[in-house]
């Protein structure tokens, strides 16, 4: 009992020491705890001396607080999200932007945004190339710095921090850094923040304006922010005469400038020749798009092939990060599947100059940099010890308290955001056997294991095996790259993959959109195998279908993307329907008039010229006569009179007839009128064919003038054969005159008053 009491006191005091801020051993805490603080100050030194003994006792008793492996996985490998450029850098760039012409800078910024949008939309087969800084004007350089410098710095800072974690020896060596990246020596700036002061720094840049910016930043600004400044050397081109001289070569956002594969491979050969044979490192970093990852994938394959094709051991190479293996990349980007790339994100705070030339509604204080990268070490092969070492439960995590650099290189890496569900965590990793694995870590696996899974993040090392695992289909040939001595094969196609048999253990988890469910698939497979002898046709076909497709279970991010896609699609359809309805509204009147004139619908006289022939103008004497009644009227205030000279005419179907109307101008001035007509009943209009009449023609009558207007017509013989017309004995032909009006161009305006 006294031992436990002392132990709890020590633990309480240690936690109290971590929770409060001290200034000359005075705690900034409320007044009510002064008694406790006096006792704490008196016993502080004794607690500090006894705490190391207590920690060793915890290690021996397997308590989780002392596990250095857990400390590494949960704390040490975590990257800070509080990344930002130094204030003096921000002030310098802000001053450059304010002195330049605002219109040109804004134009080039919009061009860069359009290029980024075009890159994400174009397929990989389409040609695309970034503009090199060699041909940029001064405003273009400033626009590129405004758009890319914070993102590029955050990406490189994250990559170099990860490199320092995985390969701890790199910080102990004498550093000779060569920065070949795009921009004002951003790789060198990031290396200053991660590694100790290097022995030498060289920056490759040809643009005169960028060289001036590099000089101002690295010679005037950086020395005032660092206790041990290093003056870099600016080079116009790669120093090919200094082969095997640099321990760290950084090339960021450069591969997209290459016009062809030959130029890309020549550039990679030149970079590789500059890397030191004694464990030198080559860092390649591009934007986290499909095209950027494709270039990183090509460079990775090419350099590994180059090292395998040489027998000299000093040219051996292996991947330091992010891949835990040197085999073929298991991610097949050619399928065009969403999220089918290996990329990572880094949170950072935007610089003040990044908010210039940005609408107020789009301004924000932080953002995320999306990038793909690879770090290759030259002259050293991958360590083979502990390649199969994995941890499954809390006891394994507590037994392994030592973390070494060779072990970290073979640990799986999380390649997608973990899916943290209620009671379990789903984690997708790239493993050391060149396969993609999905680990499901439930609460029942252990408190420490579940805590580790909940604390894991995208890009972390994750050596813990889940209680449930699914493996992507793979083959032995993916562990070794195919020899390509004559031609350089970049990510060769999958024709070497073996056929998947029915009883294979590979799960179709990584086929299709993104993820698939495994539990229901496995449960039904067992049920189908048990009952397949009873219903062979049903269960065999369903099992084959399930093995190929599986039951889809998308992540929350995919569900959100799908919702936004459906929302946008619905909006597009509504807009298209609205435009179509508006156009149909304007076209309805002339279309209806055309329809009526062709068919006679709605009482409109039939004007189809194909019916006006002599063969149809033959009377049907065996049919009854139809009485045609005439009517005349004028519209509005038109000072005319219109009346038919005959009230009615009896005609046979097919018999022609001639009728007359009389129009009189009763006013004291000349008037131009236009007549329209109608047929009643409307269904008979299709058979009422008009050969000649005065409708829709401008009729000018002088003051008090009177004229006769003829109407020559016949009823189509098909009228007698239509059963719907057998009860129709009377047809009314009505004409209406209205005054003609004209616009400023002399065109007739048909307006009824």
UniProtKB/Swiss-Prot annotation:
Q: Where, in residue ranges, is this chain on the Mitochondrial intermembrane side?
A: 592-753
Kindly state which keywords UniProt assigns to this record, in alphabetical order: Iron, Iron-sulfur, Membrane, Metal-binding, Mitochondrion, Mitochondrion inner membrane, Transit peptide, Transmembrane, Transmembrane helix
An example of a GO molecular function for this protein is: copper ion binding
Q: State the source organism's domain of life.
A: Eukaryota
UniProt: [4Fe-4S] cluster binding residues: 323, 329, 342, 430
* Maturation and modification: Specific enzymatic cleavages in vivo by mitochondrial processing peptidase (MPP) yield mature proteins including rsm22-1 and cox11-1.
Site annotation (Cleavage) points to: 568-569
Key word Mitochondrion present in the record?
A: yes
- Name the InterPro entries on file: CtaG/Cox11_dom_sf, Cyt_c_oxidase_assmbl_CtaG, Ribosomal_Rsm22-like
Q: Which GO terms describe its biological process?
A: mitochondrial cytochrome c oxidase assembly; mitochondrial translation
Give the transit peptide range: 1-39
Transmembrane region positions?
A: 571-591
Any matching Pfam family: Rsm22
Q: Which GO terms describe its cellular component?
A: mitochondrial inner membrane; mitochondrial matrix; mitochondrion
**What family is reported?**
In the N-terminal section; belongs to the methyltransferase superfamily. Rsm22 family. In the C-terminal section; belongs to the COX11/CtaG family.
State the protein's name.
Rsm22-cox11 tandem protein 1, mitochondrial
Q: Which gene encodes it?
A: cox1101
């Amino acid at each position: 009992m006294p031992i436990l009491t002392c132990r709890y006191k020590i633990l309480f005091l240690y936690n109290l020491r971590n929770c409060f801020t001290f200034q000359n051993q005075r705690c900034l805490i409320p007044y009510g705890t002064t008694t406790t603080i006096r006792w704490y100050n008196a016993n502080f030194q004794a607690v500090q001396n006894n705490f190391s003994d207590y920690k060793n006792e915890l290690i021996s008793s397997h308590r989780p607080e002392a596990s250095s492996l857990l400390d590494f996985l949960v704390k040490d490998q975590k990257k800070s999200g509080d990344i930002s450029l130094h204030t003096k850098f921000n002030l310098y760039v802000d001053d450059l932007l304010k002195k330049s012409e605002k219109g040109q800078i804004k134009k080039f910024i919009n061009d860069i945004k359009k290029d980024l949008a075009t890159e994400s939309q174009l397929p990989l087969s389409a040609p695309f190339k970034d503009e090199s800084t060699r041909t940029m004007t001064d405003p273009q350089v400033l626009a590129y710095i405004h758009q890319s410098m914070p993102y590029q710095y955050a990406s490189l800072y994250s990559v170099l921090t990860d490199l320092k974690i995985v390969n701890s020896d790199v910080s102990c060596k004498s550093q000779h850094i060569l920065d070949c990246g795009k921009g004002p020596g951003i790789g060198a700036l990031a290396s200053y923040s991660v590694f100790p002061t290097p022995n030498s720094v060289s920056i490759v840049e040809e643009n005169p304006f960028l060289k001036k910016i590099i000089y101002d930043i690295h010679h005037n600004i950086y020395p005032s922010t660092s206790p041990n400044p290093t003056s870099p050397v600016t080079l116009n081109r790669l120093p090919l005469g200094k082969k095997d001289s640099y321990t760290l070569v950084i090339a960021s956002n450069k591969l997209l400038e290459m016009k062809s594969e030959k130029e890309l491979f020549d550039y990679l050969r030149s970079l590789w020749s500059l890397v030191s044979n004694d464990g030198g490192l080559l860092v390649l970093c591009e934007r986290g798009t499909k095209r950027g990852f494709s270039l990183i994938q090509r460079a990775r394959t090419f350099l590994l092939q180059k090292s395998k094709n040489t027998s000299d051991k000093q040219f051996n190479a292996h991947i330091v990060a992010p891949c835990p293996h040197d085999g073929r990349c298991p991610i097949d980007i050619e399928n065009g599947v969403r999220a089918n790339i290996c990329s990572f994100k880094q949170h950072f705070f935007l610089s003040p100059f990044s908010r210039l030339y940005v609408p107020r509604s789009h301004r924000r204080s932080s953002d995320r940099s999306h990038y793909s990268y690879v770090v290759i070490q030259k002259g050293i092969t991958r360590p083979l010890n502990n390649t199969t070492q994995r941890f499954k439960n809390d006891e394994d995590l507590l037994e392994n308290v030592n973390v070494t650099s060779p072990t970290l290189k073979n640990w799986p890496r999380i390649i997608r955001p973990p899916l943290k569900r209620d009671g379990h965590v789903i984690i997708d990793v790239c493993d050391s056997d060149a396969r993609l694995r999905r680990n499901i870590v439930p609460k029942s696996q252990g408190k420490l294991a579940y805590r580790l899974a909940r604390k894991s993040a995208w890009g972390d090392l994750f050596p813990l095996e889940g209680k449930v695992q699914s493996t992507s289909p793979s083959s032995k040939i993916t562990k070794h790259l195919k020899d390509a001595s004559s031609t350089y094969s970049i990510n060769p196609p999958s024709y070497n993959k073996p056929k998947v048999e029915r009883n294979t253990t590979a799960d179709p988890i990584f086929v299709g959109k993104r993820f698939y469910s495994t539990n229901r698939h496995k449960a039904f497979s067992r049920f189908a195998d048990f009952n397949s002898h009873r219903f062979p046709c049903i269960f065999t076909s369903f099992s084959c279908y399930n093995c190929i497709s599986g039951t889809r279970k998308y992540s929350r991010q995919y569900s959100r993307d799908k919702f936004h896609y459906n929302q946008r699609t619905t909006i597009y359809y509504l807009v298209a329907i609205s435009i179509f309805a508006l156009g149909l509204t304007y076209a309805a009147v002339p279309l209806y008039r055309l329809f009526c004139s062709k068919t006679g619908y709605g009482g409109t006289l039939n004007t189809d010229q194909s019916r006006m022939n002599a063969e149809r103008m033959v009377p049907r004497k065996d049919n009854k006569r139809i009485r045609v009644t005439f009517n005349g009227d004028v519209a509005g205030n038109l000072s005319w009179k219109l009346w038919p000279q005959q009230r009615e005419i009896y005609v046979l179907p097919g018999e022609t007839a001639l009728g007359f109307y009389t129009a009189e101008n009763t006013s004291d001035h000349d008037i131009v009128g236009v007549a329209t007509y109608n047929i009643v009943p409307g269904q008979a209009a299709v058979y009422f064919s008009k050969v000649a009449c005065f409708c829709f023609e401008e009729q000018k009558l002088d003051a008090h003038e009177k004229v006769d207007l003829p109407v020559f017509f016949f009823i189509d013989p098909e009228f007698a054969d239509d059963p719907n017309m057998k009860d129709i004995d009377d047809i009314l032909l009505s004409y209406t005159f209205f005054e003609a009006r004209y616009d400023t161009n002399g065109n007739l305006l048909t307006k009824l008053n």
